[in-house]
Amino acid sequence: VKGTAVVYGGDDRYFNNIFVGGEPDEGWKCGTELYNGFTSSMEEYIEKTSVYLSDPDKVSGVRQPVYINNNSYLAGAKGFEKEKNKIESDYDPKIRVSKENGSFYLEIDIPEYGLVTDAQQVRTHNLPIPRITEAPYEKPDGTELVIDRDYFGNCRAGTPTAGPFEG
């Protein structure tokens, strides 16, 4: 261990996901709306913390940046207020898990209008570098990380749909 640091929340990344709500309880939230109030870039974080450099207690109150984009929110799930490309809908995808002949199947009804489809493929160059480690997201051998396959190994387009399944 070369050092330690306190992480006060944030420094998270959510790209190309599907969030599904449900029956809300008081105080319950689903989706990325829990990040409302967080900064959304390292530049914004530095700008907000620079005014408190003489008071570490106030610096710790500034939320670290989160990087959230190209997600779909269904059945009451809500997105981050600064997310630029998202779909929010009350559509219920009726998610089910069924079992046939010893195998399990995920069933989901996709809305006719689809899910976010003009997203970027997740790659090393579009995953912002973490604040504390300052190390890029890459493969163990140091080459570029490219998420170009879906859950089943099918090729993901240069503009993939939200969620684990392409097409």
Segments from the language model and where they lie:
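Glycine- and acidic/polar-rich repeat regions and solenoidal domains
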Residues: 1-120
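Active-site and glycan-interaction determinants of carbohydrate-active enzymes
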Residues: 117-158
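A short, sequence-level motif marking secondary-structure junctions
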Residues: 112, 123, 162-163
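Acidic side chains
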Residues: 69-71, 148-150, 161
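Short, surface-exposed, low-complexity cationic segments
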Residues: 159-167
